[in-house]
Design a protein with these regions (language model features):
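Short S/T/G/P-rich N-terminal loop/turn motif that feeds into the first structured element of a domain
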Residues: 1-45, 51-63, 67-68, 77-94
Length: 94
């Protein structure tokens, strides 16, 4: 599933520093893949798109990494009506 995240950024420096870890797919838990990061020019807000096995898995990873650097809102993307989503990430062989 695709999950969108709306970030209201409280501490831009901390958000970017902590967010570097989020952008590295090898740091994410299994089944959680970062797909897009779109910050505002003034770094007061950002949106992200993730792939994940569940919304809760994405939320737990992001909230535990960013801490108080941002307030985050999550929702599952309706892929039937969405436009411009990235192709699904390849699944790792077991």
């Amino acid at each position: 599933m695709y999950v969108a995240v709306l970030h209201r950024i409280n501490d831009p420096e901390a958000m970017l520093s902590r967010g570097d870890r989020l952008g590295d797919p090898s740091s994410a838990p299994p089944g959680v893949v970062p797909r897009q990061f779109c910050p505002s020019k003034d770094l007061s807000a950002a949106t992200c798109v993730w792939e994940g096995d569940s919304l809760d898995a994405v939320r737990e990873y992001i909230d535990s990494t960013l801490g108080d650097a941002s307030e985050n809102t999550y929702f599952e993307i309706d892929t039937e009506h969405a436009q411009g989503l990235p192709e699904p990430a390849p699944m790792e062989a077991s």
